[in-house]
Amino acid sequence: MLTNDDGFFSEGIQVLQNKLNKIGDPYIVAPDNEKSATSLALTLHHPLRVKKIDSSTYAVSGTPADCIYLAIQNILPCKPKFIISGMNPGPNLGQQDISYSGTVAGAIQGTFLGIPSVAVSTLPDERGKFHFDFSANFILSLLKQLIPHSLPQGVTLNINIPSPPVKGIKITKLGQKRYHPEIVSKKDPRERDYFWIGTGMPKAIGDKNSDVNVIQDGYITVTPLHRDMTDYDTLKNKDLSALFQRTKYEFS
């Protein structure tokens, strides 16, 4: 099954569906419009609508996470063997991107439901062109290897593919980006303030072996993400435990 946060009509998901027809019957269940930066949001305050576009494509009036829930419980004829979220036109690299990304969230939602899931994002070349066919060929080759072996329980793969030629593939950890978002302030016709949040141009910082830096060297990055977000080092921190014990006594 395929989903994304750009909409069922986006070039990346269409190219990927056509390519994966070689090894199966991939369904698209994706938003009916742009849903970037929605993370794991669910639509709870108004009903969702589903439109059948063709025999293997469904458009949902919701987020990527909504799409996964509806696909598994109401749309697909059977539980999918794999979920691919993407291909996103633009990177999803580093701790900040994956926290906001609807593309990554679609894959994480699949993992929550016990289905092996992968998020795929692509980077443009110097002219701004996305090489979706090249990226789809890589995903096709990868799935041939992954489907027989699945993924470890609770693990989602976050894959970012630079423009060709690529030097190879590296398993990486998440890096960090330093964002300086531009806040644009304007006034409406009634002189009320309103704002747009811009992303600005982020700068990669930190470990040279992290995804945000490795991809700049021309490598495909594959970053395993785990649904368990517990910080086990802090969990063992005796000072933190003592602090909360003192808080408990003062509170009671």
Model-derived segments and their meaning:
Residues 111-134:
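Glycine-rich phosphate/pyrophosphate-binding loops
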Residues 98-105:
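Charged helix-capping and loop-helix junction motifs
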Residues 106-110:
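Hydrophobic/aromatic ligand-binding patch that stacks against planar heteroaromatic rings
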Residues 132-252:
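Electrostatically charged, flexible surface regions
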Residues 1-20:
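N-terminal beta1-alpha1 ligand-phosphate binding loop
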Residues 14-74, 78-79:
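A cross-family phosphate/adenosyl-ligand binding-site feature
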Residues 78-98:
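Glycine/small-residue-rich loop that forms an oxyanion/phosphate-binding "nest" at active or ligand-binding sites
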Residues 3, 29-31, 61, 85-88, ...:
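Short beta-strand segments
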